């Protein structure tokens, strides 16, 4: 008998999905999930297949297949895109790959749910393609400073009405493809500087994201990585 005091027992971080799990097939994932269950894990980060959420959301907004694929970073870099550090780096070129990842991601979440786990899903911090004005005119978007020498990324102003529109579109597409399981991870300006200085801007970001989550899911819990916490965002 294994007794674990902690109620919430999370497993894996974003980097793991590139450092270790990038090329895992279903057989390897099933073995990992069974191992999680045996060790008492009940809240695994579950982002496999998020390529499909990005792709089909952008398609719904009016992007072409190539335009949507271009925003999605390649296999080795996608987790850093989901942390907001980069985008469009060694971009995808094949929609069939997106659909293959979608199928694998569904199997993973189904198995986690079957074993009584609660998947932590991807949230939204307002990161958008640099071409967002083509489909959402008059959107107020900023350049976010370069992270580790990668090209700059783009962030919708949290006070802009399209901040919630874009974020809700992503969350709804994720629900359609994978279900909604109440825990949503995102780390605004992870290991980077915000585009605007001052606590007020960070408070606006935190408030906008929190209100978006609860509007989408009344049971929503925002999950963040501890080492990049910003107090004004957390307390907003």
Language model features with spans:
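Aromatic-lined carbohydrate-binding surfaces of glycoside hydrolases
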Residues: 3-236
């Amino acid at each position: 008998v294994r007794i674990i005091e902690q109620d919430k027992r999370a497993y894996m971080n974003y980097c793991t999905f590139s450092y270790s799990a990038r090329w895992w097939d279903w057989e390897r994932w099933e073995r990992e999930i069974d191992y999680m269950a045996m060790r008492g894990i009940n809240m695994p980060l579950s982002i496999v297949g998020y390529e499909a959420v990005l792709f089909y959301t952008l398609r719904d907004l009016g992007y072409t297949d190539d335009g949507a694929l271009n925003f999605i970073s390649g296999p080795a870099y996608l987790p850093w895109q989901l942390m907001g550090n980069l985008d469009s780096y060694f971009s995808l070129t094949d929609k069939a790959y997106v659909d293959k990842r979608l199928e694998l991601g569904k199997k993973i979440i189904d198995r986690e749910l079957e074993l009584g786990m609660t998947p932590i899903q991807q949230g939204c911090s307002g990161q958008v393609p640099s071409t967002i004005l083509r489909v959402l005119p008059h959107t107020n978007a900023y350049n976010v400073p370069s992270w580790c020498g990668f090209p700059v990324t783009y962030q919708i102003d949290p006070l802009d009405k399209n901040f919630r529109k874009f974020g809700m579109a992503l969350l709804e597409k994720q629900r359609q493809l994978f279900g909604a399981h109440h825990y949503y991870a995102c780390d605004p300006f992870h290991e980077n500087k915000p585009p605007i200085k001052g606590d007020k801007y960070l408070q606006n970001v935190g408030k906008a994201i929190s209100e978006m989550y609860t509007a989408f899911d009344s049971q929503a819990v925002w999950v963040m990585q501890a080492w990049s916490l910003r107090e004004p965002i957390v307390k907003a």
